[in-house]
């Protein structure tokens, strides 16, 4: 039976490229001259650490990160920005958590949406992904269109399509 998986994966190399592009842009921008600004990607615990001189620069850094992620085809919905915290040197810092995988409640919403559509497919939650199977590939493509039209708070990718 044809099937596919609904997943939430972040291409870490593309995210690394986006972070490096932000670093280059910070070096060349006039409004960031003579200020301490850091952005670094921690691959192990899947987070990005931002450090800026003040909140205005932090907002600019956040906007640059989101726009560079879009350019690199990384959905900015996978970035969860934590609260801005002051540091001892009068600067501000912020952690950005990279969300990967589909949580249980989001997976349940996806399965409920598929079941409510009355299409002849079955959806099953498997760890951090949802497997959708059906008798016809056309039904599976309708499910993909249905899920693309909805907002679940996380970016969704459709992989492993088997006929």
From Swiss-Prot:
Family as reported in the entry's similarity comment: Belongs to the YajQ family.
Keywords carried by this UniProt record: Nucleotide-binding
Entry protein name: Nucleotide-binding protein DvMF_3058
Record-level GO cellular component terms: cytosol
One family name in Pfam for this protein: DUF520
One GO MF term attached to the UniProt entry: nucleotide binding
Keyword presence, Lipoprotein: no
InterPro entries referenced in this protein's UniProt entry, alphabetically: DUF520 (IPR007551), UPF0234-like_C (IPR035571), UPF0234_N (IPR035570), YajQ-like_sf (IPR036183)
Keyword flag Cell division: no
Annotated source species: Nitratidesulfovibrio vulgaris (strain DSM 19637 / Miyazaki F)
């Amino acid at each position: 039976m044809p099937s596919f998986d609904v997943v939430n994966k972040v291409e870490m190399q593309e995210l690394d490229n986006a972070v490096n592009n932000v670093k280059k842009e910070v070096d060349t921008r006039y409004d960031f001259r003579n200020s301490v600004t850091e952005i670094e990607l921690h691959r192990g615990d899947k987070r990005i650490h931002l450090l800026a001189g003040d909140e205005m620069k932090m907002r600019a850094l956040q906007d640059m990160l989101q726009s560079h992620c879009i350019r690199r085809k990384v959905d900015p919905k996978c970035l969860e920005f934590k609260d801005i915290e002051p540091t001892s040197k009068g600067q501000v810092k912020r952690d950005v958590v990279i969300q990967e995988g589909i949580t249980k409640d989001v997976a349940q919403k996806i399965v409920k949406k598929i079941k409510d559509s009355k299409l002849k497919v079955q959806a099953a939650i498997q760890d951090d992904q949802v497997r959708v199977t059906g008798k016809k590939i056309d039904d599976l493509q309708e499910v993909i269109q249905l899920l693309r039209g909805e907002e679940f708070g996380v970016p969704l990718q459709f992989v492993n399509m088997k006929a």
